[in-house]
Amino acid sequence: MLLSLVADELMSNAFSATTMDWSAKQHEYMQRAIEVAEKGRGQVRPNPLVGCILVKDGEVIAEGWHDHLGGLHAEQMAIHDAEEKGHNTNGATAYVTLEPCNHFGRTPPCTEALLWAGISKVVIAHGDPNPIVRGNGISVLENAGIDVETGLLEESAATQMREFLHWCENRRPYVTVKVAVDVNGSVDDLSKDAGRFTSEDCLKEVHRLRKDCCAILVGANTVIRDNPSLTVRLIETEKQPLRIVIDPNNKIKSNSKVLNDGHKTKHLTDDFRGLAAMLDMLGDLEIQRLLVEGGPSTITKFLDQGLVDEFIYVQSNITHESPKLSSFDLTGFTKSVETVWGEEKVTIYTR
């Protein structure tokens, strides 16, 4: 998908949802399309998650999702799935979470695939966020005589694609901060050597979070104190996130794990020009979601400059003997999720 910075004057051409009453069945079909799109999570960046369901005579005959970068798009996979199952797609309705593309990229246009398959109606959750191509897919389909309806579960699709949409609109990554504390809000026990104090099940959720991010960032002090790997280890992944270490004074040791384990690390020393400039640089590298796992100093700098989009607060039930207490100003954030990771309470705040 061709991507560009969203210009304010172009937003007037934005995707507008069809005004209509959707049936319970239609909600069910689109919800299923959103669910199957999740199968591509962590495998398709910088492309978005997309799912597609084909329905004919009131029955789901096929489903597809964007599975990996360079692979079939969701619509193409759904059509292939129908063929594999022996279903005739002529006259079917496609429920797709993102406006079908109408340009040649790593794959041919999805609009052509839908036309070739004889799809008679396309229901779209969310429009293409790129103002240069937005609406072109819809226009091509409508001009070919296909009935197009838009906006079904648009907010749900937007939530699923939030990092992608944020990147398209801002050319910067969506910034998630994750911090773990003891029962009293201490981030570290200074009486002990550095080490994890959360449960194994919580760590697995952290690794799931890491897998969903393009890059992981810490400051020099975290590397010096913890010597972390900052990799995804407890769940399967095809690609490790880029590690970023902010170290303007070049303090970390040359034998640190992040510099010697064979995975990619961007070590920012005298080339560090501030957080805003760094986020611009990461946006140019197609980094769509950045996970900040640094200490209080690094986290506070991100918060003070208004650069955090999501804040994940993980609270253990243990008590540090020699606590390093910290507080974070979350003015402007809203508590969006309360959950549990293993033995830890987790609160997620979003801006």
Residue ranges and their predicted role:
Residues 2-6, 10, 14-48, 106, ...:
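Enzymes that bind and transform nitrogen-containing heteroaromatic metabolites
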Residues 43-44, 70-71, 138, 152-180, ...:
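Proteins enriched for Cys/Gly/acidic motifs involved in redox and nucleic-acid/cofactor modification
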Residues 44-58:
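N-terminal glycine-rich anion-binding loops that anchor highly charged ligand groups
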Residues 53, 93, 176-180:
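Residues embedded in well-ordered beta-strands
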Residues 54, 59-156, 242, 301-303:
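Zn2+-dependent cytidine deaminase-like catalytic core
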Residues 126, 161, 191:
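Short, flexible helix/strand-to-coil boundary loops that buttress conserved ligand/catalytic motifs
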